[in-house]
Amino acid sequence: MASTVMSLKPAPFSVEKTAVKGLPSLARSSSSFRVQASGVKKLKTDKPYGINGSMSLRDGVDASGRKQKGKGVYQFVDKYGANVDGYSPIYNTDDWSPSGDVYVGGTTGLAIWAVTLVGILAGGALLVFNTSALAQ
């Protein structure tokens, strides 16, 4: 009987990369693209907005049954430099135009706005009419 050598070790598995004509390569190339933040921008508020956000919990525990540590959002005041627990509007009253009672575009701007609105509504009505049974 002839003895054959059998090994229980797995053979190394390798896949050869072959380029197929007509297909783009899916291999990623290294690039030098890098995203970097410009720096920390702190919010400046002259006056606080909203209420102070003090917590008064029943029996001193929150909804999950844990005692409050007293930190809340106040731990981020130094980091963000603003009243983090209050209402912070997008528009500040200091930035508003002093002549805000009058539309800057005038009657010409209002006419252009009205014609644009009527055109959009008429176009939508025309599309609905053309795709309905009434158009037949």
Curated annotation (Swiss-Prot):
Coiled coil: none annotated. It comes from the Eukaryota. It is found in: Plastid, Chloroplast thylakoid membrane. Keywords: Chloroplast, Membrane, Photosynthesis, Photosystem II, Plastid, Thylakoid, Transit peptide. This is Photosystem II 10 kDa polypeptide, chloroplastic. It comes from Nicotiana tabacum. One of its GO terms (biological process) is photosynthesis. Belongs to the psbR family. The keyword Transit peptide applies. The keyword Chloroplast applies. Pfam families: PsbR. Residues 1-37 form a transit peptide. One of its GO terms (cellular component) is photosystem II oxygen evolving complex.
